[in-house]
Amino acid sequence: MSGNVILVGFMGAGKSSVGRLLARRLGRCFVETDDMITAREGRSVPEVFAERGEAYFRALEEETVRLLALKSSDVIATGGGLFCREGRPEALKALGTVVWLAGDFDVLYERARRAGERPMLAGRGRDEVEALYRAREPFYRQADLTVDTTGIGPDQVAAQILLALREIPSPLGRGPQGEPPPEARRAHQREGRP
């Protein structure tokens, strides 16, 4: 498993805000899949949706997932639907630790509405958006870690993710920051190693 930390979740979960904070605290690069798409297309996500449609955007996301395989130790914030296609959970989990930023639907919906241009909100009523959230939930539940963002700010969410990441053993016996797990640190200290 590579050292990427991949944030998934519904719109309004705070993936961008939390991702920036987390990257800063881990000393890593921050990447947003929507930014990768807008850089390639030369236009915003809402413009891509309006001009080319959702199917075209989803094809761009598929290409973006392939490009993410080139990343090895970044913090990556995904678009809300990127994780929610057959085979995507497995593909992204192969690239790093996937963290679902969960939350109460009503809270997420209000955050997304306040944030402005959200193509998946355009022309949809609250009930339709909730149905979309419920359809995506089974995918999100496949993440390696879940952090509930309801009632806490991005700083606290990032702190919870950092704590959870330190508990995950890596195949090399090192945590996401390259630190040996606590029991290995104690053994190294007894042996006089750093």
Where in this protein do the model-derived segments appear?
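NTP-dependent small-molecule kinase module
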Residues: 2, 21, 25, 71, ...
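Hydrophobic anchor at the beta1->P-loop junction of P-loop NTPases
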Residues: 7
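P-loop (Walker A) phosphate-binding loop of NTP-binding proteins
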Residues: 10-13
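Walker A/P-loop
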Residues: 16
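ATP-dependent small-molecule kinase phosphotransfer cores
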Residues: 29-93, 117, 126, 137-139
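Short glycine-rich anion-binding loops that position phosphate/pyrophosphate groups of nucleotides
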Residues: 80-82, 104-106, 152-153
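A glycine- and Lys/Arg-enriched "phosphate-lid" helix/loop adjacent to the NTP-binding pocket
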Residues: 94-138
